[in-house]
């Protein structure tokens, strides 16, 4: 159930260039395999517990990966609480310290704002150890409210949907929001 998805840079008319792989658990695949008629996200607290458990499995899997395919340039979707856990400390101890700067930890915006103090602690610790922080779960209409520099995130990740093109066309300040966030720091 652990999947990979490439994050690429598109510069001008050049072909996309892979920057890193996102490592994640497909909740849809998990649901289809275990409980096809159940919405795993319906109960936020139960879903949080599920994702915290999945985070720990992903950390264990990545830190024990011995085929060399995850030796740099990858990201993981994690909960803020996972970064503050013993399992993350174990993960941190098990990886080569030189790899940390090529690992991006993606944190959901809703998780960040549910406990901003925990986020600040987790972010500060992770960045001190050398990891990059990506603020994930931002929709086009919320971008204007997010200040990447104030949150001290290294990257912003926008959830994309084709209908967002209408919002972009209607919002004359959208380019300003993108420029404020810095294009090169957006996914």
Question: Residue ranges of each PLM-predicted region?
Answer:
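Bacterial c-di-GMP phosphodiesterase EAL domain
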Residues: 1-97
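The catalytic core of metal-dependent phosphodiesterases that act on cyclic dinucleotides
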Residues: 96-187
């Amino acid at each position: 159930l652990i999947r990979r998805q490439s994050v690429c840079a598109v510069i001008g008319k050049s072909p996309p260039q892979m920057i890193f792989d996102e490592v994640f658990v497909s909740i849809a695949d998990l649901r289809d395999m275990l409980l096809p008629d159940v919405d795993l996200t319906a109960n936020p607290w139960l879903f949080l517990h599920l994702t915290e458990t999945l985070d720990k499995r992903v950390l264990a899997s990545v830190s024990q990966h011995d085929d060399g395919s995850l030796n740099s340039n990858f990201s993981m979707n994690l909960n803020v609480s996972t970064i503050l856990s013993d399992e993350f400390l174990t993960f941190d101890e098990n990886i080569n310290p030189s790899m940390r700067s090529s690992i991006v930890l993606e944190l959901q915006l809703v998780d960040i704002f549910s406990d901003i103090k925990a986020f600040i602690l987790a972010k500060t610790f992770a960045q001190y150890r050398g990891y990059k922080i990506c603020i994930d779960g931002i929709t086009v209409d919320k971008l204007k409210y997010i200040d990447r520099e104030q949150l001290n995130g290294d990257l912003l990740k926008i959830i994309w949907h084709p209908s967002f093109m209408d919002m972009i066309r209607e919002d004359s300040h959208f380019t300003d929001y993108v420029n404020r966030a810095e294009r090169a720091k957006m996914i």
